[in-house]
Amino acid sequence: FLNHSDFVFLIKINFMELSNIEPQIIWKNFSKLNAVPRPSKKEEKVIAFIKEFGENLGLETTVDEVGNVIIKKPATAGMENRKPIVMQSHLDMVCQKNNDVNFDFETQGIQMEVDGDWVKAKGTTLGADNGLGVATIMSILESSDIPHPDLEALFTIDEETGMTGALGLKPGQLTGQILLNLDTEEDDEIDIGCAGGIDVTVSQNYSIEASNGQIVRIEVKGLQGGHSGMDIHKGFGNANIILGRILYK
């Protein structure tokens, strides 16, 4: 794991790159978050980071048995009778790197850079899904000038590979009457519904036959890429489908 000096140094590098982007408080918190390793199913470091963040603010902070972190912030003056709100984001990120990059997602923080109008990571995934949602909630929790009702910040784990954090929630952990999920693509849109998802397990009997053929390595790369949920209808090349077609022929 990063020692303290490495952690602080990486935050400084990241924040220097992002220091002129508004709102600065969100990008500051995103820089801090991205200095902490947070792969799915191995979120121990980021759980400890968020727990310490809430405790340092003097807010009621708990970690449930599966690893979700809940931070509660009382309503500001005059907002006590409004419906309490739950703000939710997930702590884990998709961990992918370029083939020519030597990077360990379990021990290293993400290095960010500004490229024109874009914030990018150097050779790895950025972690904006759902790091920007987490950073936004952190910024609201530490703000002193935003009127709000009672707030409950819910940081779930393992969204990318199983939803075990959300599935592990138990009745009574939250009291909020409105849930805001901060895991959408546009910051000026509010989604009021979701199609949901389905997991399918397919099995088939097969037998292995001996072969004296030559082994060939096939690599499919250079495709457009994209999110399997948001871009599935756009007809982009899919490496799995392309390889399947090659094997079929």
PLM features per residue range, with description:
Residues 17-117:
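Acidic/His- and Gly-rich active-site-bordering loop/insert found
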Residues 50, 54, 134-141, 169, ...:
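Buried hydrophobic packing segments
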Residues 79-155, 159-161, 166-168, 176-177, ...:
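Active-site metal-coordination/substrate-binding segment of hydrolases
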Residues 2-10, 15:
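Short hydrophobic targeting helices and cationic amphipathic motifs
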Residues 47, 130-134, 240:
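Short alpha-helical patches at coil-to-helix transitions and adjacent helical residues
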Residues 62-64, 150, 249:
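Flexible, glycine/charged-enriched surface loops at secondary-structure junctions
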Residues 37, 109-111, 115-120, 124, ...:
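Midchain, well-structured core segments that form catalytic/ion-binding scaffolds
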